[in-house]
A protein has these predicted regions:
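Short amphipathic alpha-helix that is part of the acyltransferase structural core
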Residues: 1-28, 35-42, 46-47, 132-150
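Conserved catalytic-core motifs of GNAT/GCN5-like acyltransferases
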Residues: 109, 114-136
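Short glycine/proline-centered loop/turn elements that form peptide/ligand docking sites
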Residues: 81, 103-104, 121-126
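Conserved GNAT acetyl-CoA-binding A-motif
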Residues: 90-102
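Conserved beta-strand in the GNAT
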Residues: 40, 45-57, 62-70
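Short alpha-helical
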Residues: 10, 102-103
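Conserved acetyl-CoA-binding loop-helix of GNAT-fold acetyltransferases
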Residues: 71, 77-90
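Acidic/histidine-enriched, beta-strand-rich ligand/metal-binding domains
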Residues: 67-68, 76, 105, 110
Length: 150
């Protein structure tokens, strides 16, 4: 089941397992990002995957930016993240993300994220500190945005 998630006690442990960020950094992000929604995929009432949707614009068009998409290690390879991504693509006209590595480029491409944009075409109405969060964590030599439009 997919539902909106606001409980820091559920968000923080998954975020920490996936990205190794401190609780302080996660709380700073959660408390200071103003245009945000978290969606979680629940398996038997337990959170298994989550992602954040953050308002942004690409070349003046409104998008939902998918950020911090993650799944518990013991719940991977079951399609939970794919279900969340499908939900986003079905419920929002335009969604985008920045793949963190080459493996994820292929993963997202297979899930129909096929429109490519340069990072400087993306704009957020967020503080500079939050913008730093939104662009970090990518190991690609030349990071880029992948998008899906209905």
């Amino acid at each position: 089941m997919i539902k909106e998630l606001n409980d820091e006690n559920l968000i923080i442990p998954l975020w920490q397992e996936a990205f190794s960020d401190s609780e302080e950094d996660i709380l700073f992000f959660l408390n200071n990002c103003k245009n945000i929604k978290c969606l979680g995929y629940f398996d038997e009432k337990m959170l298994s995957s989550m992602l954040f949707l953050i308002d942004c614009k690409i070349n003046g068009d409104e998008y939902k930016y998918i950020y911090a998409a993650c799944t518990y290690k013991n719940k991977r390879c079951r399609g939970d993240m794919s279900k969340l991504l499908d939900y986003c693509k079905s419920n929002f006209n335009k969604v985008c993300l920045i793949p963190a590595n080459d493996k994820l480029v292929d993963f997202y491409f297979e899930r129909k994220f096929k429109i490519k944009y340069d990072l400087n075409e993306m704009q957020f109405d967020e503080s500079e500190e939050i913008k730093e969060y939104l662009f970090e964590g990518c190991s690609l030599e030349k990071p880029f945005v992948l998008a899906h439009n209905l």
